[in-house]
Amino acid sequence: MVRFISFTSPIAALLLLSFGVKHASTASTNTCIVANSDSDDAITIAEAFEKCKTGGTVVFPKDSSYQLNSIVTTSDLKNVNINFAGTIHLPAREESYRNGDYYIQIKGTHIKMYGGGTINGHGQAWYDALDHTAPSVLRIAANDSIIGGFTIINSPRAHLNVTNSTNLVLHDFTLHTVSNNSYLPKNTDALDLYHSSGITFRDSMLTIGDDCVAIKEDVEKVIVSNVTCRGGHGYSIGSLGIGGRKDYVKHVNFRNSTCIDCENGVRVKTWAGGKGIVEDINYNDIILQNVDNPILVTTHYCDPNVIEYCNGNDDNSLNISSIHFKDITGTASALGNPIVNVNCSIESPCSDITFSGIDITKASNTTDNVCVYLEGSDEVSECSS
């Protein structure tokens, strides 16, 4: 079911020689072309990865199409190229997938994934059912890897879920999820990050229904650059500290990115009662066009179903410090919310939050900026406008 090419054959050896010594020395040992299954292409995809998981190349040919009827889990990949030029269709909505972690997992070290292919999440059935419990489309747990250059459409939930990864570059993604009716796609974050370090996300176009980027628990050393997001919930730190959990996020740089018609622009959100730290977060050269909440820092994040817990723990949250907003420009929406809204906790006030080059045009009904429990707010000009 998997076409398996050995590079020990005489023909393959001649091909390698034709590419020169440099290419031959770095070429993968085997190539596995993913075939179709009679019942579930998840089976043949798994076979291809198993046969080429060490030093191989897995190929989804251009114009090929694959229908998944179960999840795909790959692990222990080492020095693997994934030439993803085809189309993968995720399964139809079924109860068995509710609250699952992912549909496809890529896990290993030194992975290169490219090719211009498409994953179609067929999320409309989930939106129509008001069911926000679908798995993420693609989970990545990869070290020293480069993944990108392909498209995810109609995601039933988060598009990219990155966890337990180090030194990972994500680039040139097109993520496009919209509903064809009034039932909107919920929880369809473009990128969620967990338990990772040294992550770059760049050069991507996003049209989604939730966070453009959500940097969640225990993440550090992140760069987000040259990303355009439409209709999302902004470039977010968090949410963090749910249920009193101890989390951290530090050393994050968002730069040269745009948010258009977004609910939030740049945002830090932590739960009431949470523990831990958020520090050294930098937003530079961000354009916000028609955004409801341009700059938002809150330690009072909560879900309606646990509002009693949040109200009882509202006096403290994570320690938020060294958050810098520089050259944030654009326009606020007609919703009338403040340009700057910093709302921290009495027992864990925010500190060292700075603003420079903030040039966001107000709507006629925009209310005054808010700075609550921000140390040194008397000396912050944005807190008096």
From Swiss-Prot:
A single Gene Ontology molecular function, please?
Answer: polygalacturonase activity
Q: Where are the PbH1 repeats?
A: 165-195, 196-217, 219-241, 249-270, 350-376
**What domain of life does the native source organism fall in?**
Eukaryota
Effect of pH on activity: Optimum pH is 4.0.
Query: What biological process terms from GO does the record include?
Result: cell wall organization; pectin catabolic process
Signal peptide residue numbers: 1-26
Q: What is its main location?
A: secreted
This enzyme catalyses: [(1->4)-alpha-D-galacturonosyl](n) + H2O = alpha-D-galacturonate + [(1->4)-alpha-D-galacturonosyl](n-1)
Membrane-spanning regions, if any? none
Q: What is its EC number?
A: 3.2.1.67
* SMART domains noted in UniProt: PbH1
Q: Name one GO cellular component term.
A: extracellular region
Temperature and function: what does the record say? Optimum temperature is 30 degrees Celsius.
Give the family this protein belongs to, as stated in its UniProt record. Answer: Belongs to the glycosyl hydrolase 28 family.
Q: What does this protein do?
A: Specific in hydrolyzing the terminal glycosidic bond of polygalacturonic acid and oligogalacturonates.
What protein name is recorded for this chain? Exopolygalacturonase rpg15
User: From which organism does this entry originate?
Assistant: Rhizopus delemar (strain RA 99-880 / ATCC MYA-4621 / FGSC 9543 / NRRL 43880)
